[in-house]
Amino acid sequence: MSAPGGPLARLEARLTREWQRRGALAWALTPFACVFGLCAALRRTAYAQGWKQPVDVGVPVVVVGNVTVGGTGKTPTVIALVDALRAAGFTPGVVSRGYGANVKAPTAVTPASRAAAAGDEPLLIARRTGAPVWVCPDRVAAAQALRAAHPDVDVIVSDDGLQHYRLARTVELVVFDHRLGGNGFLLPAGPLREPLSRHRDATLVNDPYSGALPPWPDTYALALTPGAAWHLDQPALRRPLSQFAHERVLAAAGIGAPERFFATLRAAGLAPATRALPDHYAFADNPFVDDAVDAILITEKDAVKLGASWRDARLWVVPVEAALDPRLIALVVEKLRGRSPA
């Protein structure tokens, strides 16, 4: 795990900037992008032509993923989708890779799990939804284990895994933030894992800056709204963000797109100092000990990694709620109910 401000973190920051334009570095990397694109196309073709067969796990699967590198808002989208499916009469479960955790076999994630053993995003999903959550690099194995343990589950939501073609899916939802496809180049010349033209059932765009939607078919706005902050040591203690406006505040985030979190706080009227930590930052020690501030605002995804040994009375957690377009929910429900039994 790269340290804050370390060489890897600086490289990540530079690539993120370069991926938003077609500069000299992007053009220099295009030969490698062509090789990457060819390999990705061969994998897609193998399943499209039937040379490889996806595995049907016996219930419909909704994949929430992205075609770009970095955070786009998938985790709050998964949480909102699980709640929406439950409200529509389904019994959803969730599978995830468990990125950042040492997971080799299908593993159940409960609210009492540790982030180091489950992954920060799956643990957050388990705590927020109460749905069965299983993790494994092999999402098919995770889905099969989930179904065996919870036979009442009638739909599985895959947190990421858009490129995990071995898992048969009924619906694919692709999430973008304001950066969309960046410079439009594939890795490593750009941020794209697959071409922007890749088929999907619907596109969700979270743009806290302009709110504009690209002219793509079946595209819906994704609104991420912060709630009242809760105290890390005393979760029942809550404060609206407006109460931090006249305090010395540091906002810190170890997520794929930390600037989006900072922009959310600014939109709420705050002017915090900011610190971008590497995605999935482990918090082996306290990086805030030398910060002379009254309050430190962090994300829920970071909060699940802070165990009982953490004692910093300045830490407040800012939850984020995703609001899904009712038309999108109706589209997903219609596709799920129209699926033929396996």
Curated annotation (Swiss-Prot):
Secreted recorded as keyword:
no
Pathway given for this chain reads: Glycolipid biosynthesis; lipid IV(A) biosynthesis; lipid IV(A) from (3R)-3-hydroxytetradecanoyl-[acyl-carrier-protein] and UDP-N-acetyl-alpha-D-glucosamine: step 6/6
Which NCBIfam families does its entry note? lpxK
Underlying gene? lpxK
Relate the protein's function as given in its record: Transfers the gamma-phosphate of ATP to the 4'-position of a tetraacyldisaccharide 1-phosphate intermediate (termed DS-1-P) to form tetraacyldisaccharide 1,4'-bis-phosphate (lipid IVA).
Residue sites binding ATP per the record: 68-75
What is the name attached to this protein's record? Tetraacyldisaccharide 4'-kinase
Which keywords has UniProt assigned to this entry? ATP-binding, Kinase, Lipid A biosynthesis, Lipid biosynthesis, Lipid metabolism, Nucleotide-binding, Transferase
- Which organism was this protein described from? Burkholderia cenocepacia (strain HI2424)
- Give the domain of life: Bacteria
